[in-house]
Amino acid sequence: MRPRWTGSGSPVRVAQLADAAVLSGQRPLRPPRSPRTTSPYPFVPMSRPLRILLACSCFAASAALAQPPTTPVPTAPAATAALPSIATRTAGMVRRDGLFPLYWDERTGKIYLEIPAMDQEFIYFTSLPWGVGSNDIGLDRNQLGAERLVAFSRSGPRVLLIEKNTRFRGVSADANEARGVEESFARSAIFGFTVEAQDGLRVLVDATEFVVRDAHDAIGALRRTQQGTFTLDRTRSAVYMPHTKAFPRNTEIEVTLTLAGTNPGRYVRDVTPNPEAITIRERHSLVALPEPGFHMREADPRSAFFGISYQDYAQPLNGQFVQRFASRHRLEKKNLGAARSEPVKPIIYYVDNTAPEPIRSALVEGTRWWNQAFEAAGYINAFRVEVLPDSIDPLDVRYNVIEYAHRATRGWSYGGAVTDPRTGEMMKGHVILGSLRARQDFLIGEGLDQPYATGTEKAERVQAMVLARIRQLAAHEVGHTLGMAHNYISSAQGRTSVMDYPHPMISLKTNGDVDITNAYETGIGEWDKVAVTWGYGEFPGDEKKQLDSVLVAARAKGLTFLTDQDARPVSSASPNTHLWDNGVDAVTELKRMMTVRERALTKFGETAIKRGAPMATLEDVLVPVYLHHRYQIEAAIKVVGGVTYAYTMRGDGVAGPVSVPAARQNTAIDAIADVLSPANLALPRSLIAQLPPRPFLFEPTRELFDRWTGITFDPLAPGATIAAVTFDLLLNEERAARMVSQHAMDPALPGFSDLLKRMELHIFASAPLSAYDFTLAALVQRSYVDHVLTLAESAEMPLVRAEARAALVNMLGTTLRPGVTGRGSAYTGQLAADIRAWMAGNYKPAEKKVKITVPPGSPIGEW
């Protein structure tokens, strides 16, 4: 039978704690005391009146315990006779009727909330209508907070707003069993109110202090990012009535808050007129629960759908204790059982009308791609996209919105949702797109396309590339708000999903020029159609079996899913699952990309900037071109010590994990070493000659290369940057440990010591080099030894430490042996001295490691 949420209250909860204790062999919490003739406690004589009082108390307690539990009858408390009526108390105030009626007292600046009934659950969340504007702090305009399942509860003159605990449940028809679970786990009282007036069961409370507070925890965000100590200044905070509204199914209260602080950090100083006073706006949303009837779909790790989970203590011992369900919007066919049907109610998304053209139109076009997936799932016009009209509040829970947010520096875009914690039903999708991503993409395009031959061109090819990226970005973030996680393996399967992180696919024309016209795919991907069919398709009959068949059929076509946990860690093992990569084979694509990069750098010059721009700003455009292969290096490195695997289920017949073959690993090692060759690190001398120091008014930013040379451009620092990025990934201690383990299981596979030997041969290869190339090679050697020393010092696996130490000892007798003279002897001599000092306990690699700051990489567009 399909699970369908039919109630309007919380799920029934249960826990058989006593039985669980017996079954687990644990001692009961309060074991019955065995009969005994003497008390373990000293006897204290009691007077006769005290004995009578105690006896009466015990009798009363016994009688109370003997009574069956009763359901309280809603009645108005007797003590409320002295309370005024709501009409009397709110006379002269502005009333806004809705789910929770509001009363605004203009004279005192207070706002009152009418509570129609106690113990009725609803959803409460906060948001940030007016943000801070710093990507690093993270307090973006219209950012959503976490949703909470709450209810008002009254005790005499006090009303508490209680957050329910939805992580522990007992889904059972036995009310006592359910109550046992509910009472076993703590709830959270969010706020306490005093009753001001009453009409029967309806009460009025002063909500001013509840709403005029930092409920979104902006102060915490400032503290966590080390931006100073801030507190709420109530004298500079107030209810913001223009955006305080009440509707039949939601009540919205907005407030202006001023956070006062001392010693504000750099990020705050960058974005506020007075960094000691940060004035923002926060909103409190009180939302009715969705109507009953939402169909809960059991989660499947192969499907890419996010979800909710909870422990169900009412499950039998052989049942599924942890329950998991997919998070989805409510979508139903008008004609159940029809192969294709219009929906009962379509899913509609609104694009922020503050986004400028042509970006706004690109956002609309890219978001509309999702209708292709819903059509493939059997729907007709089930997914629509419109521009947000002025009459719709973007934070109103009734509307799905794509927000265009501005920040001082570039940063992530992301998609979120307001979700019913009981069922996983998505009530509101909400996307926040960082506007500076488009400008960063434009910068990338300028560097690759070199569009300014005369210096006044409009760079139309670059703009077309950026708009293609914006379309894909909109589709990606909306995918999250439809319930789907990243699918980072799709690039290795032919760019089959918008839920991947796409690197621009740049190629060379037949004449050798760089071609940016096919940078991004158009339209929804084949995997996305599979995911939407699994998540939103109608499956009459045996749903579980039919859902499984969707994923089995997809696998047969080569369409699978791996996500963040498989791609984001620097030690991750999948050779096919990466961020910002391209190509079916990571190493082959790295070699192709190196050819494109070489051509782009050879061509690079003043045609990358407009006429009249300071020549020093060439470096701004140079950085993404020089680091063009940055993420493909990471992808190729994951082949080393790599393991091919999938999310498998018992009985699906899918093979288990397999180590990447030795030949492919060794090819990857050689390709990575080639990246570090001086020829691939050096900049054209003609380009270096065009890069003056930064001029007046053009301060250096974190988007530029680090430098040891002060004000002048440092031609060595870019190469040192690539070396640092490469060795941080390649000589990761978990990757090293995996290579030790793989070699132990199969000696034909390269072990960690084999990796070190192979890299040493490449890095210390003797060849006639120019002074520039020789110095770059010395920096690579320094970085390599620093990383090996770090592993020898602090790797958690002892065998990794041992093999790293052995490699260092071997270097002292070969590459770094005494007596080496000539060019570079000072560099190699210092390396040898540092290794010997470490072996003597007089050198700490973590303290001595070459420090170089790498320019920010991610995002190239989304989260």
Positions of the model-derived regions?
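Conserved catalytic/binding loops enriched for acidic/polar residues
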Residues: 493-863
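Bacterial N-terminal signal peptides that target proteins for export
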Residues: 41-53
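Sec-exported extracytoplasmic/periplasmic mature domains
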Residues: 368-379, 479-480, 504, 634
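Auxiliary tRNA-acceptor-end handling modules of aminoacyl-tRNA synthetases
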Residues: 67-355, 373, 382, 387-440, ...
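Bacterial N-terminal signal peptides
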Residues: 53-62
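The catalytic-center signature of Zn2+-dependent metalloproteases
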Residues: 387-405, 468-524
